[in-house]
Amino acid sequence: MASASTSDHSKQAGGAHSRQRDSGLLDQLGKFFGQEGSRKVPEKGKEPATRSVLMAPTTHKAHQAAGRQTDDSAVVHFFKNMMSPKKAPVQQKARSGASRAITKFIWGTDGQRPHYGAAGSSKSKEAYRGRRDGSGTLSSFFKMGKKGEGSPARR
């Protein structure tokens, strides 16, 4: 009984978990997204039973696949949704009279804020025209350097 066969040595060398491999990042992602049984190696004698278990849809997986195409895996579906642009919400075109009146009161009749509306635009346009006419700061600096203008000491 002291001697051991070669098959006993191979079982001891690999340890008790020689058939199980360490789970990597992809395996953990697959488990997280509900594909835990897809990469298992079937054991001897249990192959038909494992196939039927793997192919039978569970309620969790069927519920999870309801919103996406069945040919996409959960990981592919996740990354497709992350990369696809979000759709802007559709604005309602028909509003009630009260909400339209409140909107006009807040935004003005032109759909702009009162500060930027027709009454306030004349002040900003006048300031802009003044700069266009050459009365801005840089223009006045350059005019100082011309002959016949500026302080008498520079003439």
Curated annotation (Swiss-Prot):
It comes from the Eukaryota. It is a peripheral membrane protein. Residues 37-49, 123-134 have a biased composition (Basic and acidic residues). Residues 1-70, 109-155 are annotated as: Disordered. It holds the Pfam family Myelin_MBP. One of its GO terms (cellular component) is plasma membrane. It is found in: Myelin membrane. GO terms for molecular function: structural constituent of myelin sheath. Its main location: membrane. The modification N-acetylalanine is found at residue 2. Keywords: Acetylation, Cell membrane, Membrane, Phosphoprotein. Belongs to the myelin basic protein family. This protein may function to maintain proper structure of myelin. This is Myelin basic protein. It comes from Heterodontus francisci.
